[in-house]
C-alpha cells in the first residue's frame, strides 16, 4: 500500500503564505520563468551525534507527482484578496516542470551538504519549499533517533510503540515509517503496518488485566485465545509478587499442556535493570528459559544503554514517546536556500551571509561526493563546482573550510557522487527503492562504511565536509563581493 492510499488530502496549500505572496510577486514582475537552483541542507546533527539519516524522499516524490491546485484551493486564495486573477489562473494550471536531484533515501548524511537540489522556474521552486522541509525535517529526525536507540540495544529487538504520544496521526504513521528506516524491528501502529508493510507487534494493556477479576483469569483467557503468541503484561499490581508468578502458573497450567510456550512477559514500570534480572531468575527456575522479557516505559538510547551496562536481562524494548517525538532534541533544522539564478546560458551563484558564521550558505551549483579509503571506509564528503570532475585513484586537491590555509590531496581514494537525478522536466526518472531496501541500505552503510568512532554517542568523531580549492575560492570571492 502506498502512502497516497493512506493520505488522500490535497496538500498544495501546505505552504507558508509568503511562498504564495513571493510567487505572486515574481509573476507580476514577469519573472515567473526565471530558472533557479535551491539546496536543502541542515546545520547540526540531533543530540550532537556524529551523523544523521536522510528520510522522507518517497513522500516528496508522491507530492511532486500529484501537485496541483484544486478549485477549492483557488477559491480560498481568491478569498484572501491578495492575488490577481491572472496569477490565480496560472495556479489553476500549475504543475512542477523542473529538475530535482537527491541523495538516496536512507543515506548517512552530514551537516551543510546538499541533500536535495531543485532547479526549476522560480515560482515552482518556491512553492514546494514548505512540503520538502516538512518531510525531510520530520522523517530524518525520527530515523536518526530510532537508529541511536537501535544501536544502544546492541542487537536486541526494538519496537515502535509511540503512536499515542505522537504529535498527530501523520507524525504517528510517518514516524513509524522513519523509525523502521532507522532500524526498529516493528511497530505497534496498525495503520503504518498496512500502509508500509512494517511488521506489527502488540501485547496487552493494563486495562485487559483490570477488566477481569484477577491476573490469573486475564492471563488464562488471553493464553486460550493467542496460545504461543502470548506476551503477558506483569506489572499491573506487583511484578515480582503477583505478575510473574501468575504468568508462570498460566504457562504451566494452560500453555504447556497444549504443547505451547509462553512467548514473553512485558515490564512497563519500575527499575528495569533490577526487575529484569529478578524476572529472568524466576522464569528460568520455572523452566521457561525461552520466555522473552520485554521492557517499555519512557525508554531511549541512554536508558537502554544503562540497563545493559547494569546487566539487565531484557530481550526486547518497546520505545514510545522518546522515539516518536525525538524527545531529547526535537528538531532537525533542514533549510531551503537559493544557490544560483540562471542568467542567459549560465548559472550565477548566490550566497547568504550572516553575522553567525554557521548560517553562511554554500553557494552555486555543486557536486557532492563521498570519499572512500582503499579499505572502503568513508573518510570525508567533498563539495566541488558542478563543472569539476574527480577520478578514482587520481590525486585531487581539497581543503577544509575550517583550515583553508592547508591545501591537501586525496590520494588512492574512490569517489561516489551522492546527488542522483530524481526528476527531469517534471517527470520521475528513477525507480524508488522499497522500504526494506532503504532500511538495508542504512544498515549496510553503518556496518561497512561509517567509522565506529562516528557512531559513538559521546563526543563522536567529526566527519569532514571538505571543498575543492576551486569551489572554496568561488565562495570566498562571493563573500568579498558582498562586503
Residue ranges and their predicted role:
Residues 2-34, 44-46, 82-83, 88-97, ...:
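Buried, small/hydrophobic-residue-enriched core segments of structured protein domains
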Residues 56-59, 141, 434-438:
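Short amphipathic alpha-helical segments
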Residues 202, 294, 315-318:
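Short hydrophobic alpha-helical runs that function as membrane-insertion/retention elements
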Residues 75-76, 144-148, 162, 454-461:
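Short coil/turn segments at secondary-structure boundaries
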Residues 288, 292:
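Active-site neighborhood of glycoside hydrolase catalytic domains
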Residues 2-34, 38, 47-49, 299-483:
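Gly/Ser/Thr/Ala-enriched C-terminal appendages of enzymes
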Residues 36-92:
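N-terminal, Lys/Arg-enriched amphipathic/low-complexity engagement segments
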Residues 16, 56, 69-73, 83-85, ...:
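Alpha-helix initiation/capping motif
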Amino acid at each position: 500500500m502506498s502512502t497516497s492510499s493512506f493520505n488522500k488530502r490535497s496538500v498544495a496549500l501546505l505552504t507558508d503564505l509568503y511562498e504564495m505572496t513571493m510567487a505572486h510577486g515574481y509573476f507580476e514582475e514577469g519573472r515567473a520563468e526565471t530558472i533557479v537552483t535551491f539546496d536543502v541542507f541542515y546545520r547540526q546533527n540531533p543530540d550532537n551525534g556524529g551523523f544523521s539519516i536522510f528520510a522522507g524522499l518517497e513522500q516528496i516524490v508522491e507530492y511532486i507527482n500529484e501537485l496541483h491546485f484544486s478549485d477549492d484551493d483557488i477559491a480560498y486564495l481568491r478569498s484572501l484578496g491578495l492575488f490577481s486573477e491572472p496569477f490565480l489562473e496560472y495556479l489553476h494550471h500549475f504543475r512542477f516542470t523542473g529538475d530535482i536531484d537527491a541523495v538516496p533515501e536512507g543515506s548517512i548524511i552530514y551537516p551543510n551538504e546538499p541533500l536535495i537540489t531543485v532547479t526549476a522556474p522560480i515560482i515552482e521552486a518556491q512553492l514546494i519549499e514548505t512540503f520538502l522541509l516538512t518531510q525531510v525535517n520530520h522523517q530524518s529526525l525520527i530515523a536518526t533517533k530510532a537508529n541511536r536507540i537501535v544501536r544502544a540495544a546492541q542487537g536486541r529487538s526494538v519496537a515502535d510503540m509511540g503512536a499515542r504520544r505522537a504529535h498527530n496521526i501523520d507524525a504517528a504513521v510517518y514516524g513509524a515509517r522513519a523509525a523502521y528506516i532507522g532500524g526498529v524491528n516493528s511497530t505497534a501502529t496498525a495503520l503504518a503496518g498496512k500502509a508500509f508493510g512494517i511488521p506489527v507487534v502488540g501485547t496487552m494493556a493494563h486495562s485487559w488485566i483490570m477488566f477481569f477479576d484477577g491476573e490469573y483469569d486475564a492471563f488464562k483467557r488471553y493464553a486460550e485465545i493467542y496460545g504461543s503468541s502470548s506476551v503477558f503484561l506483569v506489572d499491573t499490581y506487583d511484578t515480582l509478587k503477583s505478575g510473574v508468578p501468575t504468568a508462570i502458573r498460566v504457562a504451566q497450567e494452560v500453555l504447556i499442556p497444549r504443547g505451547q510456550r509462553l512467548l514473553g512477559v512485558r515490564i512497563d514500570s519500575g527499575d528495569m535493570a533490577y526487575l529484569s534480572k529478578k524476572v529472568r531468575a524466576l522464569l528460568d527456575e520455572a523452566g521457561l528459559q525461552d520466555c522473552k522479557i520485554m521492557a517499555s516505559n519512557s525508554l531511549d538510547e541512554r536508558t537502554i544503554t544503562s540497563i545493559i551496562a547494569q546487566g539487565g536481562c531484557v530481550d526486547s524494548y518497546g520505545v514510545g514517546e522518546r522515539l516518536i517525538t525525538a524527545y531529547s532534541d526535537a528538531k532537525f533544522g533542514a533549510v531551503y536556500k537559493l544557490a544560483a539564478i540562471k542568467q542567459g546560458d549560465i548559472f550565477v551563484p548566490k550566497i547568504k551571509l550572516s553575522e553567525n558564521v554557521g548560517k553562511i550558505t554554500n553557494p552555486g551549483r555543486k557536486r557532492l561526493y563521498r570519499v572512500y579509503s582503499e579499505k572502503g571506509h568513508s573518510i570525508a564528503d567533498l563539495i566541488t563546482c558542478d563543472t569539476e570532475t574527480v577520478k578514482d585513484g587520481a590525486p585531487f586537491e581539497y581543503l577544509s573550510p575550517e583550515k583553508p590555509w592547508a591545501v591537501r590531496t586525496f590520494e588512492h581514494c574512490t569517489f561516489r557522487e551522492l546527488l542522483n537525478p530524481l526528476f527531469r522536466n517534471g517527470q520521475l526518472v528513477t525507480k524508488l527503492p522499497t522500504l526494506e531496501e532503504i532500511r538495508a541500505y542504512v544498515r549496510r552503510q553503518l556496518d561497512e562504511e561509517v567509522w565506529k568512532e562516528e557512531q559513538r554517542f559521546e563526543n563522536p568523531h567529526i566527519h569532514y565536509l571538505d571543498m575543492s580549492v576551486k569551489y572554496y575560492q568561488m565562495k570566498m570571492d562571493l563573500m568579498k563581493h558582498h562586503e
